[in-house]
Amino acid sequence: RQMCIRDRTREAIFATAEKIGYKKRVIYPKIENVALLYFVDHEDELEDVFYHGVKDEIIKQAKKMNIQLSIYDRKDGMDHVPKDLSAFIAIGWLTRKEINALYKRCKRGVFIGTSPDEKLFDAVKPNMDSFVTQMVDYFVEKGHKRIGFIGGSDRNIDTGKPSMDIREWSFRQSAAYYGYLNEEYIFISERFTVDDGYRMGKELLKKEILPTALCVASDTLAVGVLQALNEGNIQIPEQVAVFSINDVNIAKYLSPPLTTIHIDIPCICETALDLLRNRVLYGGRVTKLVFVNGIPVFRKSC
């Protein structure tokens, strides 16, 4: 027996549902045998809470999307990863040898935070290039001309040796565009630790003339930089303004509270899982590289 509902009544029901925020429940088809490759070195995890946040969020969202995950980390090695995977999600840094071995096991995969071979696999990344460009643009609009950069290195997947990180590259391009690129104000370490930020902050203080603004590649580095500047009795932002990336929880409690670009980890993870579902359910030969933008959170450091 069918129930007849007038168009006006139906419209009223839909309007009320929309008003109270009702959302239709989505039934996701089950996807089994998906590997979560958490190939993050212990030192890297301590340096950048981004990785750990992504791992936790992927596990939470995968459960909601009916995706069955098995987790493997770097100490397990590629030999422990099954050869009959439906798909995989990779977080962290893999060598060329590991990437090739992974491709032989499974051709359906999504990398988060890196795109080691965009010809082979999908990837979702924070739009670091845009973040740094926004930072430089902001400082220039505020009248700064002596703009510095504090960051870390990337790694070459073929050699394992340090290579230029996209944030440094973007800073150099943006600063050069305005005619403000000064090598004396660029400080690079191999890693992104608080200690490295502190050390580079101390090196900065040795300069006879300080930059009036600093772009810092991550909040973790910025914690150390702020400590060094505070110990040097540098007034922030009056003498040196500081702008960073990540918006970790501690950022709002630093002295002064840190201006930073918020990275939307839930959005990144949802995008990655959507790519994975589409790849498993519908196939397709063209790989996708997705950049997720961030939102500046202005506090008292600039």
Residues covered by each model-derived region:
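Flexible loop/turn connectors
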Residues: 200-302
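Periplasmic-binding protein-like
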Residues: 35-36, 85-91, 148-151, 187, ...
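Hinge/beta->alpha junction and helix N-cap segments in small-molecule ligand-binding domains
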Residues: 41-49, 73-77, 124-134, 150-200, ...
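N-terminal helix-turn-helix DNA-binding module of bacterial transcription factors
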Residues: 2-30
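Alpha-helical recognition/docking segments in bacterial nutrient-uptake
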Residues: 31-137, 141, 205-206
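Alpha-helical structural signal in soluble globular domains
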Residues: 16, 57-61, 166-178, 224-232
